[in-house]
Every structure is written in C-alpha cells, then in structure tokens.
C-alpha cells in the first residue's frame, strides 16, 4: 500500500493506493465516526462494488444509497437533484459524509453536491476507473456539464480522503482503461520525461494489468497531481498545465455530444492536436509529436479528431473554454518532453491549418 499526502494546510488529505482496499474498513474509520453516510454510485458500479463497500461500513450510520444512470450525458444539474433530494429526505445535516463510488462523473457530481449542500459537507472519493484514479479524484475540481460547455458549473472543493483500490481495474472495460491511459500519458508529456519513457517501455505490462506496473503508474500520476495542486489549488498558474489536450478535447466532446467520445479519447486526440500546434510554432520538433502519437496508438486511442468536425465547430467551443482570457483562446502546449506552457498568441489561421491537416 502507498500513501500520498495532498498538502493544503488545514484542507490536506491522504490518497491511499493499493489492492483490496475496499475490504479494509480501517482506512475510512476516522473520517466516518459519528457521521451519517450517503454513498453515491451508478448503475454500472453498484452491482460490482456497492455491497462490498456497505459491508465494510455496516457499523456506521449508512442511509439508502443514491444510484444514478451511468454516462457523461447524465453529468447534469438535473441528475444532481437526486443527491440533494436524498439528503433532504434523510434530514441530513453538516455531519453527513458523501462517498463517491465510481468514475469521474460520479466523483465530480458528488463533490459538487458536497460543496453545495448546506454550503459544504465532507466527501470521500473511491474512484473505480483509471481516469478517475489518476486525475479527477485528486485536486478538488467538481462540476457538472451544460449543453454549451463541459464542466462549466462547479467549484473547487477538496475531499477528505481518496481511496484508490487498484482491484477495481479488473472489471474496467478495455476501452475505459485506454481512456484513462490518455491522462496517464499526459503527466509524462507535461511534467516527467522519464515517466513518459517508462510508459513507452511498459505498454504490455500496463495493458495486461500487471500489479506492479499499475501501482507505479497510478502512484506517479498522483504524486505529480498532489504536488501541482499543493502549489496551485485554484488553477491560477502551474495547474493549468494539467489541461494539456483538454481545450481541443472538450470541443470534441461538446460538438459530438457528451458520451459519444470518452473523455480520455477526446483528450488523446486533443493532445496530438496540441503537439502538432507546438511543432508548427517551433516549440518542439516532429520527433516528439511522433512519440506522443505512437504511445496513444499503442493504447488504442484516437490520434485525430472526428472527420465530421471542422475548424468553425472547434473554435466555437474553444472560445467558451474556462482558460479563455480577454476573449483569447489559451492553449497548453508542450515545449519539450516533460515540459509545457500556456500560450495565448496562437492565430486562428494556424489552428485551422492544424485541424485541417489532422
């Protein structure tokens, strides 16, 4: 078992990583004493893990869980109402703890509900997808989508604990695992060139769910994320680098319809577009673009946008991106392997050329 601390002063919290952690109630005990507990999960995860978790929490005051539909298209204010209704029906106060049992959608919605209910109650993340384990469960970004933009309604609100049970990956569909690898690869591109090289050399070990390889990859991603969040919790500086590929990627998700492309798939294609943009600007040479592209392909991820999307469709959504400043689209672009920066002086003409040639 590995433990990583997210250092945020009085809001610091541990990330616990290991096998069979959902069967070890002691990890939760100190966070749940004298609390009312509401588990939020979805229709896919509930049959797999809800009973196991409830068994470990049987000595605590657990109320009827909220089971939501599964999918990015359900990450809405309307679906969040189910969480609020349950809390109110149970006369839940600020002594309530929400537990997010699921992937990124469940984690984001549960966190936002926790931030909003009675102006803030505690919550715990138990991420069950690779993408959530290495990215969305750590750092306190909580949100729901709007038809006009992804994650536009939300808050920064930190969990009290993140429990990453790597055994959950054994039930994860291959397509979802690949989507999570897009975020894993991102960390190597923006932060750690040695980690990127390690990923290149361990593709098969990761794809076959080798325990040691998974533990190392997840742990390294969480270490990087914890350091970045500790330095820049609310994304005023270095944390923006974690959005590599996301400006293009969110445009793909919004245009195609949430859930048509998995988030990680859109991030992979978006990251290749960002790398191609950086190459056109002379920030990196073509060999880095090739390495990035080949590694995404090795994990069966898309490396180009949908054929049906044109520049006008991209730019419409990119101009609604949260990083837009004074009307200018700001892109995270690689500057070397393991290094990236934020750029606002990227012409529409260059972007159109990159998208057209993708």
Curated annotation (Swiss-Prot):
It is found in: Cytoplasm. Binds 1 divalent metal cation per subunit. Can use either Co(2+) or Zn(2+). Keywords: Amino-acid biosynthesis, Aromatic amino acid biosynthesis, Cobalt, Cytoplasm, Lyase, Metal-binding, NAD, Nucleotide-binding, Zinc. Zn(2+) binds at residues 183, 246, 263. Pathway: Metabolic intermediate biosynthesis; chorismate biosynthesis; chorismate from D-erythrose 4-phosphate and phosphoenolpyruvate: step 2/7. CDD domains: DHQS. It catalyses: 7-phospho-2-dehydro-3-deoxy-D-arabino-heptonate = 3-dehydroquinate + phosphate. It comes from the Bacteria. Its EC number is 4.2.3.4. Its cofactor is Co(2+); Zn(2+); NAD(+). GO terms for molecular function: 3-dehydroquinate synthase activity; metal ion binding; nucleotide binding. NAD(+) binds at residues 70-75, 104-108, 128-129, 141, 150, 168-171. InterPro entries: Dehydroquinate_synthase (IPR050071), DHQ_synth_AroB (IPR016037), DHQ_synth_fam (IPR030963), DHQS/DOIS_N (IPR030960), DHQS_C (IPR056179). GO terms for biological process: amino acid biosynthetic process; aromatic amino acid family biosynthetic process; chorismate biosynthetic process. One of its GO terms (cellular component) is cytoplasm. The keyword Nucleotide-binding applies. Its main location: cytoplasm. The keyword Transcription regulation does not apply. Belongs to the sugar phosphate cyclases superfamily. Dehydroquinate synthase family. Catalyzes the conversion of 3-deoxy-D-arabino-heptulosonate 7-phosphate (DAHP) to dehydroquinate (DHQ). NCBIfam families: aroB. This is 3-dehydroquinate synthase. It comes from Shewanella woodyi (strain ATCC 51908 / MS32). The gene is aroB.
């Amino acid at each position: 078992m590995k433990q990583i601390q997210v250092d945020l002063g009085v809001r610091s919290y541990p990330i616990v990583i290991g096998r069979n952690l959902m069967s070890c109630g002691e990890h939760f005990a100190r966070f749940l004493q004298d609390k009312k507990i509401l588990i939020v999960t979805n229709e896919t995860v509930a049959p797999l893990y809800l009973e196991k978790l409830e068994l470990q929490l049987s000595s605590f005051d657990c109320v009827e869980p909220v089971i939501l539909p599964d999918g990015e298209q359900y990450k809405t204010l309307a679906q969040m109402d189910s969480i609020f209704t349950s809390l109110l029906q149970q006369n839940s106060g600020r002594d309530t703890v929400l537990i997010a049992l699921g992937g990124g959608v469940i984690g984001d919605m549960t966190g936002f509900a926790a931030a909003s209910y009675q102006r803030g109650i505690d919550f715990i993340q138990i991420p069950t997808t690779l993408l959530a384990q290495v990215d969305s469960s750590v750092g306190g970004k909580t949100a729901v989508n709007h038809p006009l933009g992804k994650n536009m309604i939300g808050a920064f609100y930190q969990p009290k604990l993140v429990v990453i049970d790597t055994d959950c990956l054994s039930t994860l569909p291959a397509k979802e695992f690949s989507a999570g690898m897009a975020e894993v690869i991102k960390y190597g591109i923006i932060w750690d060139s040695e980690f990127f090289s390690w990923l290149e050399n361990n593709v098969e070990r990761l794809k076959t769910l080798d325990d040691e390889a998974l533990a190392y990859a997840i742990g390294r991603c969480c270490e990087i994320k914890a350091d970045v969040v500790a330095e820049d919790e609310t994304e005023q500086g270095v944390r923006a680098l974690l959005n590599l590929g996301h400006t293009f990627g969110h445009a793909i998700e919004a245009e195609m319809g949430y859930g048509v492309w998995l988030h990680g798939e859109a991030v992979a294609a978006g990251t290749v577009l960002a790398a191609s943009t950086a190459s056109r600007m002379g920030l990196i040479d073509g060999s880095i673009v090739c390495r990035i592209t080949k590694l995404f392909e090795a994990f069966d991820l898309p490396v180009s946008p949908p054929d049906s999307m044109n520049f006008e469709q991209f730019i419409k959504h990119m101009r609604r991106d949260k990083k837009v400043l004074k009307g200018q689209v700001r892109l995270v672009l690689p500057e070397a392997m393991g290094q990236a920066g934020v750029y606002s002086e990227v012409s529409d003409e260059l972007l159109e050329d990159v998208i057209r040639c993708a």
